[in-house]
């Protein structure tokens, strides 16, 4: 079904048709008019200066619908307004309905005008696609990625959510899960990504690259694993990411789809290009087919001829403009003459391009880079003397195929006689068929020949083998001579042969075919009658060939038989061909036509009308004339119902033209391209192409596809669209899209802007030196719009370039802004000026980013507290919100650093200042946050410490940032929290001091290990999340309560290691926790940090000193209260006090030592104190042991000789032993002492945790014991020891020696001189006793003791 707008009735409405043509700007060929508006003409094509009558207003950008034609002035065409007015009678009082009808009519008129404009534009585009001779499809353009739609983004979100919920089969460790969770929350759920998808600038590759960048830092920070490199982990994670992103989709299908899309993004065929621009311009399929056939787009000769006519028209228009002095308005008057030269040189360049095209039949769409010729004879068409052809220039090469089928009429020969044929082309080699019997003379043999003769002679002879013995040659039976032409029939035919004299068969016939191919440079051939003034001076019939020597040179040549060179030739340059009436006086020929040139006319005649039409069409293409000949009998033939088929079918192009005319398309086909304002037409097609491109499936960022670039390039070159106009329109279209939210590549804007800037400032980027006033004004307007856009993009850089995508776009934007700020293209803009502009943008950006962040935080808070709508905003709630806001602030700054702070890295020194400006931006951003932070901190009650996590969060970020560390905000943060830290340390110091005082007052000195079941009764810190340490509950009411704080490992230390007292353990943990907390603050200012450290070390030193002294006092008091007899057992508390010393020494190394050399004094001082105290404690304990030993020896002293007790005891025992068995005297004392020693040794060894202290104690104890015994014996040098004294001492000494040896006391200590003295004395006493006492010592002996020792060894 046809469109109603192209009905047959349209041909009757002449007024409407003419007005439609007027709107499109096509005027009669003889009345080329100047542009109606100089400004519109200036925006026109290079050299065309606008269109014909009405083109400026009707087709130009400023046209006002159909009425624009009236401003064209001049001749031809009716105004559309008159048509509208005459369509229906007007009412004296128009109603609302009539107004609506009028509006509807105007709308329909505008739609019809737009349709016609698009159809005309499509014709021009089709011709560019059909026969390109300037441009090619670029193969070096960056391949564009498929863009993500909103639905695809939601699908990807769902896939990642399913993975995080464990609903997929993809195995992953915790680290990868955390990375995906972070990516999902930060990137996929971001509103900035949704905006990027909406803008058409987000591709799957963007998502992948962001994830890769996101995980690289995470993977680098993972601990090293043997045999597993970080690269392996990275590639494994990316493979898993791809699996999640792809979901259940078959990768093969995805790959196939990607391959197909990649192919469509590369080189397109002609058919694909036609289809693309049908979609772009809204052309229907049947309209395309009508136009395609009528324009003969499949005929390269017709297309080349069309180009030659267009270029000739442009040269004529350039002459007209120069003659009438109707130039566009230039910035300089001197440019007018230059303008004409540019028009002509641009046409000459196109002519050279066309001339360099190979003369061929075409067919295959070749996209090779065209070789540009600079042949002077071709470019300077006016110099005929340089362009004359000689006969030798016209060289034709024909290929012939001769196929011999069979012979008839061989009756006189015997059936078995051998016959064969030969064939030759005059002047060439001779070929022969196979042999055949006379009864069946058939061959089907083909011979191939080549010749330069336009009318070759083909000879075919029939031979039979001679049977005579002396015959030298075979006998010729007959021959036939043919004179084929390229127009001759190609099928086989019967030919009568000329029979030899001696051949009895006179009716010989041969069936053969001669096919003569038409060479590529022969455009037509045939027999014509001709007569001319300079050539072919006699009216006679000749064989003519129309030869194309080059794209611009054609010759009409007449040939004689068997001649390679033409007999005569006529070069067709400057001639015009047309149909004519029969000429009187010329006999021969039926259908006449002529070729006319100033001073010469050549008349031709063919034998039939069909041949004449074909000749005129071929010569019309060759002459390049603007006038198209119309056959005088065309209408009658078309209307004839019973005309012969050959006449109707002959010129098939005429048949298609008639169909196009029937559907109203002829005006678009026959219109002269030179009469159109191609500037506005190109503006329209470029805008529509951009719309089509931005709506396709690629994330193009404004870049055209290779096929689109090719067609637009060809259109501009062929129709003379000025380069500056092209780029200005492109910039304007791109700016409109960018301002409306589309993502446009700044590099693309930069290319077009640089071109326009270079052109406007006279740098001739495309060789055009003329600059119109309109170009300059439009450039300034676009420059200002571009500056505003770029500044806005930099202000909203987080949203215009989310997560640093598109890659390099921010850097390109900065580069372009720097270019836009330049006053000209030579003088670089001062760096300070650029920095000032960008600084202003980034200051505004800080406000924009913080405002949006605050809003986001409020929305998040409202969602979280939806159930507590009426909840009051308490100081704690405000602080909690501030901490959450601080986390978001840090996240923003980290993203800025990661994604937006790289231009100076990639560009070397070009943007070295960008880092500084981003630091300023960050400080401004933080200063806005500081206002809210200060407000939240001001309302906090005094002496509360919940704000410390806020400091730690911010400080941990700031101190690791090279640029922000100790910056303005960081200093403010320190000033805010320094008094708080000092106050906190003061209170903690007071609290710890009081806990020491009160703790030691009520200290039970039980080890903590034995009190674990009673932990609530011990003064230990609360076990909560690590924040800030608690003050103990027993502090005065005047000191505020501390919030919870604990070190992660303190409970483990209490349970597993030391047996110190509750007070000491509490002290050491609090000191450690306080120092850990202050250390974890990582105070950035070195001086204050050292001050804090020094103060805490000094505090620890003082506190530990106090602990040590209090323990020493308690130790002495405890010893004084214990027993002095051998019933004494070392109490647990004594061991605990020793362990306190052990802990104090260990903790002092950590808590009291400073890294700086001179400040080791705290540590060394407390170490000395501990050492001295331990010595004193050992001395006191040893003194206690010595006291007990002295008590034992005092008991033994009662047995001394000469004492009353000794005599009495001796007599009593002797008397009693006669009647009863008296126990061995003294053994109970010895055993009690030995038990005491062993028990004390075991307790000390088991409970005291420092081996060195035990060794020192045992050494001192052993030496002191021996000294006391030695002294006691020395005092009795003159007395003989009582038997009981001797037995007791031997047992005590022997067991003491043995026990201390078992405890690890060295032999050098054990076998001291004192011990030797004691041993010798006791040995002597033993010998004496054994002599005086008949019964001896009852098995107790020093010797026995030695033997026992040896056995022990």
Swiss-Prot record:
Residues 98-109 have a biased composition (Basic and acidic residues). Residues 380-495 form the C2 domain. Residues 1177-1353 are annotated as: Mediates targeting and association with DCVs. It is found in: Synapse; Cytoplasmic vesicle, Secretory vesicle, Neuronal dense core vesicle membrane. Keywords: Calcium, Cytoplasmic vesicle, Exocytosis, Lipid-binding, Membrane, Metal-binding, Phosphoprotein, Protein transport, Synapse, Transport. GO terms for cellular component: cytosol; glutamatergic synapse; neuronal dense core vesicle membrane; presynapse. Gene3D superfamilies: Pleckstrin-homology domain (PH domain)/Phosphotyrosine-binding domain (PTB). SUPFAM superfamilies: PH domain-like. Residues 44-77 have a biased composition (Gly residues). Residues 790-1129 are annotated as: Interaction with DRD2. One of its GO terms (molecular function) is lipid binding. Residues 1-19 have a biased composition (Acidic residues). The PH domain is essential for regulated exocytosis and binds phospholipids and plasma membrane. It however does not mediate binding to DCVs. Homodimer. Interacts with RASL10B. Interacts with the dopamine receptor DRD2. This is Calcium-dependent secretion activator 1. It comes from Homo sapiens (Human).
């Amino acid at each position: 079904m046809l469109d109603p707008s192209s009905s047959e009735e349209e041909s009757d409405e002449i007024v409407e048709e003419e007005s439609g043509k007027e709107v499109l700007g096509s005027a009669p060929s003889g009345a080329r008019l100047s542009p109606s508006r100089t400004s519109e003409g200036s925006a026109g094509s290079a050299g065309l200066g606008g269109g014909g009558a009405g083109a400026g207003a009707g087709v130009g950008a400023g046209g006002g619908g159909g009425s624009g034609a009236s401003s064209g002035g001049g001749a031809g065409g009716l105004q559309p307004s008159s048509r509208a007015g005459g369509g229906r009678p007007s009412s004296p009082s128009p109603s609302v309905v009539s107004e609506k009808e009028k509006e509807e009519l105007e709308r329909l008129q505008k739609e019809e005008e737009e349709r016609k404009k698009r159809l005309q534009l499509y014709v021009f585009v089709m011709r560019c696609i059909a026969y390109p001779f300037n441009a090619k499809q670029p193969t070096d353009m960056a391949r564009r990625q498929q863009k993500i739609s909103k639905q695809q983004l939601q699908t990807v979100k769902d896939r990642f959510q399913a993975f995080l919920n464990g609903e997929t089969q993809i195995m992953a460790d915790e680290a990868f899960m955390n990375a995906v969770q972070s990516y999902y929350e930060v990137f996929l759920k971001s509103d900035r990504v949704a905006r990027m998808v909406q803008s058409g600038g987000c591709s799957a590759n963007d998502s992948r690259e962001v994830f890769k960048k996101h995980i690289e830092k995470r993977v680098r920070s993972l601990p090293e694993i043997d045999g597993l490199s970080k690269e392996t982990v990275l590639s494994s994670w990316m493979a898993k990411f791809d699996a999640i992103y792809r979901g259940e989709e078959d990768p093969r299908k995805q790959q196939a789809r990607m391959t197909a899309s990649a192919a469509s993004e590369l080189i397109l065929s002609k058919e694909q290009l036609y289809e693309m621009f049908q979609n772009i311009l809204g052309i229907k399929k049947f309209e395309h087919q009508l136009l395609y056939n009528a324009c003969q787009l499949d005929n390269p000769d017709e297309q080349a001829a069309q180009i030659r006519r267009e270029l000739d028209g442009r040269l004529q228009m350039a002459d007209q403009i120069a003659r009438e002095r109707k130039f566009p308005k230039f910035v300089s008057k001197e440019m007018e003459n230059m303008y004409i030269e540019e028009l002509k040189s641009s046409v000459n360049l196109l002519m050279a391009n066309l001339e360099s095209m190979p003369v061929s039949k075409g067919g295959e769409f070749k996209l090779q880079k065209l070789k540009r010729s600079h042949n002077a004879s071709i470019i300077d068409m006016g110099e005929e003397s340089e362009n004359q052809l000689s006969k030798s220039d016209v060289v034709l090469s024909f290929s012939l195929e001769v196929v011999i089928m069979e012979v008839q009429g061989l009756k006189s020969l015997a059936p078995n006689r051998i016959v064969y044929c030969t064939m030759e082309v005059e002047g060439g080699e001779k070929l022969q068929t196979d042999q055949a019997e006379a009864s069946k003379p058939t061959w089907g043999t083909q011979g191939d020949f080549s010749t330069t003769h336009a009318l070759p002679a083909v000879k075919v002879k029939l031979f039979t083998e001679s049977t005579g013995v002396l015959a030298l040659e075979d006998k010729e039976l007959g021959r036939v001579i043919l004179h084929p032409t390229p127009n001759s029939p190609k099928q086989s035919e019967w030919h009568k042969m000329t029979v030899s004299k001696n051949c009895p068969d006179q009716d010989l016939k041969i069936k053969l075919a001669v096919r003569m191919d038409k060479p590529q440079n022969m455009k037509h051939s045939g027999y014509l009658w001709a007569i001319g003034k300079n050539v072919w001076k006699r009216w006679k019939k000749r064989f003519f060939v129309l030869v194309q020597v080059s794209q611009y040179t054609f010759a009409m040549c007449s040939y004689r038989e068997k001649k390679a060179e033409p007999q005569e030739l006529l070069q067709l340059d400057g001639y015009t061909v047309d149909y004519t009436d029969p000429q009187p006086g010329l006999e021969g020929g039926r259908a006449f036509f002529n070729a006319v040139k100033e001073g010469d006319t050549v008349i031709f005649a063919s034998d039939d009308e069909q041949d004449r039409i074909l000749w005129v069409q071929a010569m019309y293409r060759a002459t390049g004339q603007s006038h198209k000949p119309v056959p005088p009998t065309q209408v009658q033939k078309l209307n004839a119902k019973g005309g012969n088929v050959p006449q109707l079918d002959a010129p098939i192009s005429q048949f298609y033209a008639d169909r196009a005319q029937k559907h109203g398309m002829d005006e678009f086909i026959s219109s002269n391209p030179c009469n159109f304002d191609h500037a506005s037409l190109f503006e329209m097609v470029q805008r529509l192409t951009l719309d089509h491109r931005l709506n396709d499936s690629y994330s193009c960022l404004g870049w055209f596809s290779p096929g689109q670039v090719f067609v637009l390039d060809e259109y501009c070159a062929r129709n003379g669209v000025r380069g500056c106009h092209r780029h200005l329109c492109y910039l304007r279209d791109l700016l409109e899209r960018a301002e409306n939210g589309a993502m446009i590549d700044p590099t693309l804007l930069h290319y077009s802007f640089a071109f326009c800037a270079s052109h406007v400032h006279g740098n001739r980027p495309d060789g055009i030196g003329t600059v119109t006033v309109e170009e300059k004004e439009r450039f300034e307007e676009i420059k200002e719009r571009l500056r505003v856009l770029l500044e806005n993009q930099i202000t909203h850089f987080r949203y215009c370039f989310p997560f640093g995508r598109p890659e390099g776009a921010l850097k390109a934007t900065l580069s372009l802004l720097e270019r836009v700020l330049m006053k000209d293209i030579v003088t670089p803009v001062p760096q300070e000026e650029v920095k000032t502009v960008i600084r202003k943008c980034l200051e505004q950006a800080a406000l924009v980013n913080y405002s949006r962040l605050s809003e986001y935080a409020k929305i998040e808070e409202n969602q979280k507290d939806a159930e507590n709508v009426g909840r009051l905003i308490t100081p704690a709630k405000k602080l909690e919100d501030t901490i959450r806001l601080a986390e978001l602030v840090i996240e923003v700054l980290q993203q800025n650093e990661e994604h937006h702070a790289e231009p100076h890295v990639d560009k070397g020194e070009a943007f070295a200042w960008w880092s500084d400006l981003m630091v300023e931006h960050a400080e401004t951003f933080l200063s806005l946050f500081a206002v809210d932070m200060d407000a939240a901190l001001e309302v906090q009650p005094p002496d509360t410490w919940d704000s410390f996590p806020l400091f730690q969060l911010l400080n941990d970020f700031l101190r690791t940032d090279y640029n922000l560390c100790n910056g303005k905000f960081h200093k403010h943060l320190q000033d805010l929290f320094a008094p708080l830290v000092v106050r906190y340390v003061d209170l903690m110091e007071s609290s710890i001091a009081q806990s020491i005082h009160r703790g030691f007052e009520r200290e039970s000195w039980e080890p903590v290990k034995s009190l674990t079941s009673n932990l609530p009764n011990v003064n230990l810190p609360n076990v909560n999340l690590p924040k800030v340490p608690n003050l103990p509950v027993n502090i005065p009411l005047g000191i505020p309560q501390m919030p919870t704080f604990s070190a992660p490992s303190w409970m483990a230390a209490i349970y597993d290691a030391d047996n110190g007292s509750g007070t000491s353990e509490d002290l050491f943990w609090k000191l450690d926790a306080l120092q850990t907390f202050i250390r974890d603050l990582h105070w950035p200012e070195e001086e204050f940090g050292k001050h804090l450290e020094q103060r805490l070390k000094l505090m620890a030193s003082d506190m530990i000193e106090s602990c040590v002294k209090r323990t020493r006092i308690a130790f002495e008091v405890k010893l004084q209260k214990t027993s002095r007899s051998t019933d004494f057992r070392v109490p647990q508390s004594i061991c605990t006090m020793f362990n306190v010393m052990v802990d104090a020494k260990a903790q002092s190394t950590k808590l009291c030592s400073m890294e700086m050399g001179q400040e080791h004094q705290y540590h060394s001082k407390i170490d000395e104190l501990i050492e001295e105290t331990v010595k004193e404690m050992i001395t006191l304990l040893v003194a206690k042991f010595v006291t007990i030993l002295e008590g034992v020896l005092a008991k033994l002293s009662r047995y001394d000789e000469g004492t009353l007790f000794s005599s009495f005891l001796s007599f009593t025992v002797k008397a009693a032993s006669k009647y009863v068995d008296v126990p061995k005297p003294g053994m109970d004392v010895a055993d009690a002492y030995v038990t005491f020693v062993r028990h004390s040794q075991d307790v000390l060894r088991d409970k005291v945790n420092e081996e060195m202290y035990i060794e020192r104690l045992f050494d001192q104890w052993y030496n002191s014991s021996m000294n006391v015994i030695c002294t006691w014996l020395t005092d009795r040098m003159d007395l003989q020891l009582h038997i009981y004294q001797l037995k007791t001492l031997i047992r005590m000494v022997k067991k003491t020696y043995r026990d201390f040896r078992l405890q690890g006391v060295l032999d050098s200590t054990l076998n001291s001189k004192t011990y030797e003295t004691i041993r010798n004395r006791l040995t002597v006493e033993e010998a004496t006793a054994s002599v005086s006492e008949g019964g001896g010592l009852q098995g107790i002996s020093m010797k026995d003791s030695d033997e026992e020792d040896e056995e022990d060894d």
